[in-house]
Amino acid sequence: MEAAVAPGRDAPAPAASQPSGCGKHNSPERKVYMDYNATTPLEPEVIQAMTKAMWEAWGNPSSPYSAGRKAKDIINAARESLAKMIGGKPQDIIFTSGGTESNNLVIHSVVKHFHANQTSKGHTGGHHSPVKGAKPHFITSSVEHDSIRLPLEHLVEEQVAAVTFVPVSKVSGQAEVDDILAAVRPTTRLVTIMLANNETGIVMPVPEISQRIKALNQERVAAGLPPILVHTDAAQALGKQRVDVEDLGVDFLTIVGHKFYGPRIGALYIRGLGEFTPLYPMLFGGGQERNFRPGTENTPMIAGLGKAAELVTQNCEAYEAHMRDVRDYLEERLEAEFGQKRIHLNSQFPGTQRLPNTCNFSIRGPRLQGHVVLAQCRVLMASVGAACHSDHGDQPSPVLLSYGVPFDVARNALRLSVGRSTTRAEVDLVVQDLKQAVAQLEDQA
């Protein structure tokens, strides 16, 4: 039986993929972790910050004595670190349990705000009085994370909202700006487009979308229509490339700690919270987080999230350069060992930016489905796609099919995502491991 130690940057050479356990003939067999888009290990500095908070800041942050004040100070400092990481203001950050809650909170708030406005108009009358049975309209892409897609589908089923799922272009791999603008209706209230796709690494044109929506909003306001808000789920992009809310021009941005070597909590950025951008709580209780997200704060986790954000602010350019170098080397080695005709790089679109760490590829062959190949690997720890879709068997990823990847090719897909301390030597081990796995499967046939 084999066991793998969680990767960490200060472990022996290289920390990110240090194995343990027993392999054939009871000898240790090295494991290489390449599933950093699924989750990342905690940085040692993050663990230290969390541990210190557990020892020293155990008090209730709402309490006036020293342990409580210490907890409150840690929370405020973490809020500032998150704001600095994304170029926002601390008062525009709300802590949540993670990305799923943040995304649901945005959708919930837009629905509540729509109906609050409808009620207000009904009381005041006027030219733009509400239409009976009117529903808010959402625009999103066909490749969003389930924490966006499923809540929206649920609202449609409940006849609470209308949703347009804009297909991604098979030429660029992106949700095209013109297609998004073409979907706008008078009742449109939110455009939500992920910043980078978790399976392919494709970066979406969020700044251009925001610019076009902002221009459109001027026309809408002049016509007496409410403005359209823009949300992006930045879970996969943070820690891999620079993310700045001013450059993006968004009203909401989702932050997920465990994607950038932090703990499994999250946060939500809301531009001009309560003043320019509405937010409605899903929970009601003690009034924490200015009543927007009540519940006694999880100080140690928030401390860790703040430290992880601080490390990203300090080192993001170096992280990005290293991951890009290793990812590019991985793709070179795959094509060199298997041949360019046999390797299909599923997320390379001319002129389209990708995350620096993500390689989604297929090895062509009739019996080389992704999950079958991974089962034969002795070294590689990776996935065929999103971790939340790991129970789909040999069915190809709907995301890859949306990108125009042929069915048989998509069924063979593997998603390898490298981390901050993944090395070229580990890439060599992984490529050789894939070669032996493929050879074994072909021999069995």
Swiss-Prot record:
Q: Which GO terms describe its cellular component?
A: catalytic complex; cytosol; Golgi apparatus
Which cofactor is recorded for it?
pyridoxal 5'-phosphate
Please name the catalytic residues of this protein.
388 (s-selanylcysteine intermediate)
One GO term of the biological process aspect:
amino acid metabolic process
Q: Where is this region: Disordered?
A: 1-28
Q: Which GO terms describe its molecular function?
A: amino acid binding; protein homodimerization activity; selenocysteine lyase activity; transferase activity; vitamin B6 binding
Q: Which residues carry this modification: N6-(pyridoxal phosphate)lysine?
A: 259
Reaction(s) this enzyme catalyzes, per UniProt: L-selenocysteine + AH2 = hydrogenselenide + L-alanine + A + H(+)
In the induction comment, the record states: Up-regulated in acute glomerulonephritis. Regulated by JUN/AP-1.
Modified residue N-acetylmethionine is at which positions?
Answer: 1
**Keywords, in A-Z order:** Acetylation, Cytoplasm, Lyase, Phosphoprotein, Pyridoxal phosphate, Transferase
Positions where Phosphoserine occurs in the chain: 129
* Transmembrane residue ranges: none
Q: Which domain of life is it from?
A: Eukaryota
EC identifiers of the protein: 4.4.1.16
Query: Which Pfam families would you find in this protein's record?
Result: Aminotran_5
Summary of the function given for this chain in its UniProt record: Catalyzes the decomposition of L-selenocysteine to L-alanine and elemental selenium.
On assembly, the entry states: Homodimer.
Name recorded for this polypeptide: Selenocysteine lyase
Q: Which organism is it from?
A: Homo sapiens
